[in-house]
Amino acid sequence: MEELQGYLEKDRSRQQHFLYPLLFQEYIYAFAHDHGLNDSIFYEPVEIVGYDNKSSSVLVKRLIIRMYQQNYLINSVNYSNQNRFVGHNTYFYSHFFSQMISESFAVIVEIPFSLRLVSFPEEKEIPKCQNLRSIHSIFPFLEDKLSHLNYVSDILIPYPIHLEILVQILQCRIQDVPSLHLLRFLLHEYHNWNSLITPKKSIYVFSKENKRLFWFLYNSYVSECEFVFVFLRKQSSYLRLTSSGTFLERIQFYGKIEHLIVVYRNYFQKTLWFFTDPFMHYVRYQGKAILASKGTHLLMKKWKCYLVNLWQYYFHFWSQPHRIHINQLSNYSFYFLGYLSSVLRNPLVVRNQMLENSFLIETGIKKFDTIVPVIPLIGSLSKAKFCTVSGHPISKPVWTDLSDCDIIDRFGRICRNLSHYHSGSSKKQSLYRIKYILRLSCARTLARKHKSTVRSFLQRLGSVLLEEFFTEEEQVLSLIFPKPTPFSLHGSRRERIWYLDIIRINNLVNH
């Protein structure tokens, strides 16, 4: 890491032009291996027959020597494709080498983007906003904004992405031609490139291999989409403050957007007014985005048309307009980040007293509401083999080889994580149903292991099993809200808590 940092500080003006030689440096592969392949949070652990940390440098040196050979990459890829079932160890090491090259290349192409972070002097250090890293920080923002808005657009970022578009996006920031050619080779020739994007699932579902490179490419693509979108949004807000003379300079610019040529100055505001909505809010997580506005339905339709044209003409692919759904907030519930969110209108009657006369005034208060969607969660549990499709708990046979404490700990950890993530739900009944499924599945797994009945295990381990599923979130609630309310299985607490330490979504929520 220190050697990499030293390279960054040597000559920052040359880094964007000389990235390719770094592929022949040993510390790049060591850095990629330590911070990529063995990362337990973002990457799957790599297990290699006969491989340990002591032999890692030997493997790296062997890989670098082979890379100096002519057409090594092409031959290795062809060999991996043709001999997948012949010579397990040979294929495994060849596949591992290709993965090391991919991960190391991802580290290298991230260097120009890392310069933005290390180029700031220490006295101008960017203030840390750790709280904003939490996924839950999005929901207080939605609570504050959505209750005052009228329409929401539910957007799925379109796919498939043409592979050449990904290269062109990076070409604007990386001028190293050999690196770009290598990227094209990795995308077009590797045997798993067609799993870069899986059309059957959301756009953020990538292959388990080469995650670092694919996530980097996807983030670059989304960043480019949002950059153009935010740029036009800022320019449109600026229009209201400019003089008529400035408008004449921007006719051609906005004419390209809407395919309109405006001649008369009096029609500028009529043509461009829908770009100047001050109550437009945009939130995105991975492949799904929410665009909300206080404007009319016509305004949202024009924004939809604009986004479709942007993706079609700027990124050169059909953007599937049906992936943008416009709905009125008062009649619609949208699924976002594992919650089913909506804006409810609560009726309120106020008695008004004026001298001797009194009368009632009926009004309504809009409130942002979030609940746990039961059906998607049960579907995720069924895919993970905790229950059937209908929600009937079943045992987990693959865990019967573990000790009783490990089995209870695993089920309890899953239950606590789900409770922690869904602590912002206003209705806890559905969450208690999920806890019940996990608790009974744990009991069935233990009974299957000891070849006994579920009833006997519930009687013997009832209190212990209940304590494991007594979540940390409920203990926090008991401290914050001292009002004595028992935490029964069918309780109905409505307090919502958003935690600021959740940096990634739960796997069961993300199915």
From Swiss-Prot:
Pfam name, any one: Intron_maturas2
GO molecular function, one term: RNA binding
Primary localisation category: plastid
Listed GO CC annotations: chloroplast
Annotated compartments: Plastid, Chloroplast
Record flagged with keyword 4Fe-4S: no
Cross-referenced HAMAP family: MatK
Protein name (record): Maturase K
